[in-house]
């Protein structure tokens, strides 16, 4: 496919090129294709190559075949390219970028063998399509792969392998070029005779010219057949180092030019997509910013107007820009501030100086690939939020700025105004007809990204060109979306501090498969509604008048309590995605939020938990049949749990970073396939619907408190046994526990001893213990999960229950003994001491440990004790139980002696034998040794458990202190956006 034209022999080269190292080696060396002598050009250069000095501008003007290499500019000649760039596909960046763009040759030369010009109207459309970008700001750097030896343009960036091959990009770009070239060949069939006998329409598809590394002067128009080069480089893109253009010194000059080669920088980090003035049809690529004063030089364009635009070149540049935007490195993609779009700048307008440019900045383009960055579902493919790199600040900013544009679509809103709106904004759901751009991490109000989609100043684009471009891009790049998204490597992780944690929830929820955005008709529509491609699995948008306005209830709290924010959607399938703004007008963020029909009443003390009114069971069951939720990052969405029949109407409020596989809800111990060990509570209020307020004093509800702390607490009458609080936590790599804790406190059944007993009445304590033990026995079987550890909360609760029953039995027995017998005061004091210590132990430490056990099963409360914490606390509790047990054992000995007064005397005799231990008989020393061993064991146990207690208290204190600065590390590989 190489020998299309007969004039590809080598042209004579001047001797001054012999010492350069751009000499071509190999059979692929070809001579430049020079322009015909009849194709006159103005002597004024029309292309300002970046870093091209004045020496690069040839004063001689046009080149002709008759002149040959003798008409080369002073610094180089066409021979320098003849071989060096012979085998390239795209116009390669070479140091000798010429003063004019010879892609004009394929269509724009009036004398080119009887060819007719393109209509100026069509060329004007092309001029308006591509923004002026002569500042040299680097907008979209390609990610340079390891290929490419030598100090190339991209060698400054660290090589980073990409997951997709550049040949795929070339192939798709080639398809677009062929489409443009075919349409172009029908319009101008006779414009490419200079390269030989009537090359077919595809011959101009590569119609960007480049100058060789040796030609510092005028460029030589190498119009290589694009079809050939795409296949050629597909076959050898892995060994691109064989390119003869990569020789030695030729590479260090390549930054001075504006051309690309398909085997050069498609895979590099340093090749940036640049724009060009609409009147100057240079290549769309520039590698670097112009040096110093050259950036500010004014070059006059040729006066011929806008005839020089090649449709194939335009198509190639647009498709290349769009494709590179689609598949380039997302983390380096940013909107640069300095791009200036002059939609009216024709070739007659020169490039202005910086001060003039500052005055002339009227239009600021922001071009976004429309098939990738549409923000609303138009059906079809699976859309993803294209902000791959969502660092905490810019993630929120991007979510806030995504819908920042007013209805005119121009990105002129200041970031401060946008930041004021982000709290009432959703990250994915936008108007159907609004052109949205997901602004990459650094947002500047003046910005432009060259792309194949239309500029956001859509009023300047013609309808005809939009239709043609959308047809081509939609057909070519439509099938690419899912594969491109799969091929993109998501960054490793990002972390969100507590402030952005809250903001992400406030910023809105991103919908998943069956979560429809609530779309309403915008007040004014700019652009064409059908001109944005978005591939999302969601159904088509709801018609504007077919749904009620969204209803939302978002509660923002402190960072420690952000987990318990309730995001209560109203009932009905049309309201299932609540949004802070109705999106039915350009005044976004100013909507009055309409709450659910039964307005939820927040708790009077909101630092812990806010429980919203929840609709009845029938409604919840209907909702469960209608939908299934898959919450995602930045979302708190209520879901219906179907783990068991008695809890089927339970609602779950998933906080940020949680995404649950709904089809695995049958498993009690299901794992969340999402990220954070962040908290999320399933709250169900059973009974009276009006009693939606839960007084949560000192985080009692958060700690799962289901029993009274003191016997003197009055019974909360209105909240008696009316409802329960169900909680479930889903953490990554841990178990999900569901416990039902009846919140209302049962009245303490006082079974205290009537009559004048000096023993403190243990009735309230025992009644309270009975109540919470019953609750524990009721709630424990409901959890129904396989415990990963034998010594978990349930195991400790069972052990605690046995200990409590034993101690209560002893207390009751001693109290009956005190009532039945006339006991001396000393024995009564012992009984009071034992019973009082037991009551105190049961009312404080035992309840605390029971609360910790429930807390370990219910991680919605913060902090969640681990099994090691429970074991340490259990050992400490055993010391206290052991002390009480010794007192009861002493009382049992007194009872065995019929409560005689000599029992205390015997007890007094116990200490004296200790000093007489050496002189006592053998039997007594054995007893003393046993007592000493018991004491030693107790002391060792105390030391060991004190250390455990210190560790546990340190862990709890550190967890509590760090509650205000929680950092959630979200591995983005597991996160769906």
UniProtKB/Swiss-Prot annotation:
Organism: Mus musculus
InterPro entries xref list: SAPAP
Region annotation (Disordered) ranges: 1-24, 52-96, 137-167, 181-289, 398-417, 529-582, 739-788, 906-939
Protein name: Disks large-associated protein 3
Ranges annotated as biased composition (Gly residues): 74-87
GO cellular component: cholinergic synapse; glutamatergic synapse; neuromuscular junction; plasma membrane; postsynaptic density; postsynaptic specialization; synapse
Biased composition (Low complexity): 53-73, 258-271
Biased composition (Basic residues): 221-245
Keywords: Cell membrane, Membrane, Phosphoprotein, Synapse
Stated role: May play a role in the molecular organization of synapses and neuronal cell signaling. Could be an adapter protein linking ion channel to the subsynaptic cytoskeleton. May induce enrichment of PSD-95/SAP90 at the plasma membrane.
């Amino acid at each position: 496919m190489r020998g299309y034209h007969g004039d590809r022999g080598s042209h004579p080269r001047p001797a001054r090129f012999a010492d350069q190292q751009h000499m071509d080696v190999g059979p692929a060396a070809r001579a430049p294709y020079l322009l015909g002598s009849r194709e006159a050009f103005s002597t004024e250069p029309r292309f300002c190559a970046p870093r091209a000095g004045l020496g690069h501008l040839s004063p001689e003007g046009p080149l002709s075949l008759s002149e040959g290499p003798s008409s080369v500019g002073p610094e180089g000649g066409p021979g320098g390219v003849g071989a060096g760039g012979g085998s390239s596909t795209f116009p390669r960046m070479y140091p000798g970028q010429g003063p004019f763009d010879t892609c004009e040759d394929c269509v724009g030369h009036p004398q080119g063998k009887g060819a007719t010009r393109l209509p100026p109207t069509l060329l004007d459309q092309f001029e308006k399509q591509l923004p002026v970008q002569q500042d040299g700001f680097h907008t979209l750097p390609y990610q340079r792969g390891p290929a490419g030896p030598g100090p190339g343009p991209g060698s400054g960036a660290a090589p980073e392998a990409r997951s997709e091959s550049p040949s795929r990009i070339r192939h798709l770009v080639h398809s677009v070029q062929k489409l443009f070239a075919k349409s172009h060949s029908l319009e101008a069939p006779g414009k490419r005779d200079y390269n030989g006998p009537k090359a077919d329409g595809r011959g101009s598809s590569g119609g960007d010219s480049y100058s060789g590394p040796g030609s510092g002067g005028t460029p030589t128009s190498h119009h290589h057949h694009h079809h050939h080069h795409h296949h050629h480089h597909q076959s050898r893109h892995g060994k691109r180092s064989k390119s003869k253009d990569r020789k030695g010194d030729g590479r260090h000059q390549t930054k001075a030019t504006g051309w690309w080669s398909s085997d050069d920088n498609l895979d590099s980090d340093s090749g940036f997509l640049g724009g060009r003035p609409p009147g100057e049809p240079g290549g769309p690529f520039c590698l670097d910013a112009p040096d110093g004063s050259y950036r500010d030089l004014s070059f006059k364009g040729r006066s011929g107007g806008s005839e020089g635009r090649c449709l194939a070149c335009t198509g190639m540049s647009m498709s290349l820009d769009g494709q590179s935007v689609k598949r380039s490195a997302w983390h380096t993609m940013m909107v640069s501030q300095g791009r200036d779009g002059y939609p009216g700048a024709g070739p007659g307008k020169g490039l202005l100086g910086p001060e003039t440019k500052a005055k002339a900045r009227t239009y600021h383009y922001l071009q976004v690939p429309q098939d990738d960055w549409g923000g609303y579902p138009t059906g079809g493919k699976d859309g993803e939020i294209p902000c791959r790199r969502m660092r905490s600040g810019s993630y929120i900013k991007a979510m806030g700025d995504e819908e920042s544009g007013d209805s005119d679509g121009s990105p002129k809103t200041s970031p401060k105004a946008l930041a004021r709106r982000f709290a009432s904004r959703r990250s994915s759901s936008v108007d159907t007809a609004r052109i949205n751009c997901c602004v990459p991490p650094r947002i500047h109000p003046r910005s432009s990204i060259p792309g194949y989609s239309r500029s956001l100043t859509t009023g300047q684009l013609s309808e005809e060109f939009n239709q043609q471009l959308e047809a081509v891009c939609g057909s070519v790049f439509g099938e690419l979306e899912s594969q491109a998204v799969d091929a993109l490597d998501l960054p490793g992780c990002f972390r969100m501090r507590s402030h952005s944690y809250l903001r992400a929830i406030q910023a809105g929820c991103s919908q998943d498969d069956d979560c429809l955005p609530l779309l309403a008709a915008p007040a004014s529509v700019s652009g064409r509604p059908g001109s944005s491609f978005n591939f999302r699995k969601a159904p088509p948008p709801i018609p504007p008048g077919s749904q009620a306005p969204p209803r939302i209830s978002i509660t923002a709290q402190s960072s420690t309590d952000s987990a318990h924010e309730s995001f209560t959607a109203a009932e009905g399938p049309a309201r299932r995605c609540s949004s802070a703004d109705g999106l039915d007008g350009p005044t976004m963020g100013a909507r009055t939020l309409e709450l659910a029909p039964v307005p939820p009443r927040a708790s009077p003390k909101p630092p812990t938990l806010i429980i919203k009114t929840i609709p009845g069971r029938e409604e919840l069951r209907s909702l469960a049949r209608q939908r299934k939720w898959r919450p995602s990052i930045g979302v708190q969405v209520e879901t219906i749990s179907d783990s068991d029949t008695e809890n089927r109407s339970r609602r779950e409020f998933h906080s940020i970073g949680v995404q649950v596989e709904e089809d695995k809800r049958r498993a009690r111990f299901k794992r969340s396939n999402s990220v954070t060990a962040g908290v999320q509570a399933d709250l169900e209020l059973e009974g009276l619907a009006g009693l939606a307020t839960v007084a949560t004093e000192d985080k009692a509800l958060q700690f799962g408190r289901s029993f009274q702390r003191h016997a003197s607490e009055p019974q909360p009458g209105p909240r008696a046994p009316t409802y329960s609080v169900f909680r479930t936590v889903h953490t990554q790599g841990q178990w999900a526990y569901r416990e039902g804790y009846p919140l209302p406190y049962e009245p303490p059944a006082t079974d205290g001893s009537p009559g004048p007993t000096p023993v403190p009445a243990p009735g309230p304590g025992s009644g309270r213990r009975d109540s919470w033990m019953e609750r524990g026995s009721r709630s424990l079987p409901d959890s129904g999960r396989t415990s990963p550890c034998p010594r978990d909360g349930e195991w400790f609760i069972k052990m605690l229950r046995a200990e409590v029953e034993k101690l209560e039995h002893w207390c009751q027995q001693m109290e009956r003994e005190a009532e039945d017998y006339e006991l001396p005061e000393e024995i009564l004091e012992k009984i009071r001491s034992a019973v009082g210590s037991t009551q105190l132990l049961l009312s404080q430490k035992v309840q605390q440990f029971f609360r910790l056990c429930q807390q370990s099963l219910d991680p919605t409360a913060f902090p969640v004790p681990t099994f090691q914490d429970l074991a340490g606390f259990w050992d400490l509790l055993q010391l206290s139980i052991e002390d009480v047990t010794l007192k009861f054992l002493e009382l049992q000995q007194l009872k065995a002696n019929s409560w005689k007064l000599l029992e205390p005397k015997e007890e007094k005799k116990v200490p004296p034998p200790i000093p007489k231990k050496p002189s006592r008989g053998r039997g007594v020393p054995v007893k003393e040794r046993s007592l000493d061993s018991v004491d030693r064991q107790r002391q060792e146990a105390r030391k060991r458990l004190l250390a455990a207690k210190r560790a546990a208290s340190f862990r709890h204190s550190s967890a509590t202190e760090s509650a205000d600065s929680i950092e959630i590390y979200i591995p983005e590989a597991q996160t769906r956006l």
